[in-house]
Amino acid sequence: MTLILYNTLSRREEPFTPLIPGIVSMYCCGITVYDYCHLGHARTCVVWDVVRRYLEYLGYKVRYIQNFTDIDDKILNRAKNEHTTMAAVAERFIEAYFEDMAKLGVRPADAYPRATHTLDGIKRLVYELEQKGYAYPSDGDVYYSVRRFSDYGKLSGRKLDDLQAGASGRVETDDPEAIKKQDPFDFALWKGAKSGEPSWDSPWGQGRPGWHIECSAMVKEQLGETIDIHVGGSDLIFPHHENEIAQSEAATGKPLAHYWLHNGMVKVAGEKMSKSLGNFITIRELLAKYDPLAVRLLILGAQYRKPIDFSDEGLQAATNGWHTLQEGLSFGYKHLPPDNPAITDQELENRFQEAVNHDFNFAGGLAVLFEIAKELRKEGNNLTHAGKTDSNLAQLAVKWHTLVKLSRVLGLEMAADQGETPVSEGISAADIENLIQQRTEAKKAKNYAESDRIRAELKAQGITLIDQPGGVTKWLREGD
């Protein structure tokens, strides 16, 4: 069975073939860390988490990178309003992000590069674009000359000649930078320093990077000049991903990514989510009312490229669905010996793969899981009330192991203690201290991506790190 993906770049479905057989490089545009994550972030992170899990299930070794944008006007504005620093705001919401993702069952990325940790690479890339004639300095800023890149618009399908400045949401007629630009569609690669804002030294003077160049530099630094899969929300297609392509491909002369995948946007009770409509919901607010895995199930039940509607009715239906899966998943813990062999049903796995291989049709894969879960629920009731089953117990064991395996692929895992089987208390204190030491060494070596990865790994296991003055790190286990 061949994995088929819808490629935004080609606007058609294509068979997936990685650059290197058996290995997949994957980059996700992450969050700008100025506030708590909302429903849109939940969908994006869950979808690409499951895509990564599924690729690994198929046997690929996946290197998955997700960035943090920690230099941005929104972060600066919040820092000014709270009389604190940009770094303090970023750290607070990065920590909050890890907490939210751990609750949703999103596995940590292999690295979390940040703009502030990639400044040398950003400046090198801007310099290279300037040397090749794709960028020009102007009064302390550096701009990308969009019309120099003949393929501009190939991802979004937008052509510059068809756009009017001020009408696209991309260029504002009262843009204060307009006087500095050679063309109204040019965008900033480097912004000159402003009073009261953080800035860094560069060949063009003190300043900070523009948003789009950050991701181009981080992709190159973490994964190379060309990657297999670049993902993100559909709202990033234009201008962000379009500009990433323009920057990276002008610099290298090579494709930035072979496959561009985008998840659809979020609606709340049929309306676009926005603060002005009063329906803006954070992940924390949502998880105060609903089981995180019910939220995950709702997300996976929708076609990932289409809009999804979060409503109380939909979330209640997803909650009921998660209860059904839980009842099926609990069968083995309640009714099977702990040493029964982990044999799975290949025919059921084939049906699961056949569904999901068609452009990540997770809903089709879930249908297979529900079929198994409902049978196991029925047979579990038979065992509880009649002491016997309609099917052979060995066959039911095979189906249960299949359900556990495929549920894990979708991140719909139930702890053994929920099935009335004792489990250990998790990662040991010694292992925690060992990882903290590794994180300390990474920070000393200025390997901040590894430091973030270790913190995320511990957070996923219910461990919160608290950095204190003097380089001391304390930890708390969830529930302590």
Swiss-Prot record:
One of its GO terms (molecular function) is ATP binding. Keywords: Aminoacyl-tRNA synthetase, ATP-binding, Cytoplasm, Ligase, Metal-binding, Nucleotide-binding, Protein biosynthesis, Zinc. It catalyses: tRNA(Cys) + L-cysteine + ATP = L-cysteinyl-tRNA(Cys) + AMP + diphosphate. A motif ('HIGH' region) lies at residues 31-41. CDD domains: CysRS_core. Binds 1 zinc ion per subunit. It is found in: Cytoplasm. It comes from the Bacteria. Disulfide bonds: none annotated. Its cofactor is Zn(2+). InterPro entries: Cys-tRNA-ligase, Cys-tRNA-synt_Ia_DALR, Cys-tRNA/MSH_ligase, Rossmann-like_a/b/a_fold, tRNA-synt_1_cat_dom, tRNAsynth_Ia_anticodon-bd. Monomer. This is Cysteine--tRNA ligase. It comes from Microcystis aeruginosa (strain NIES-843 / IAM M-2473). The gene is cysS.
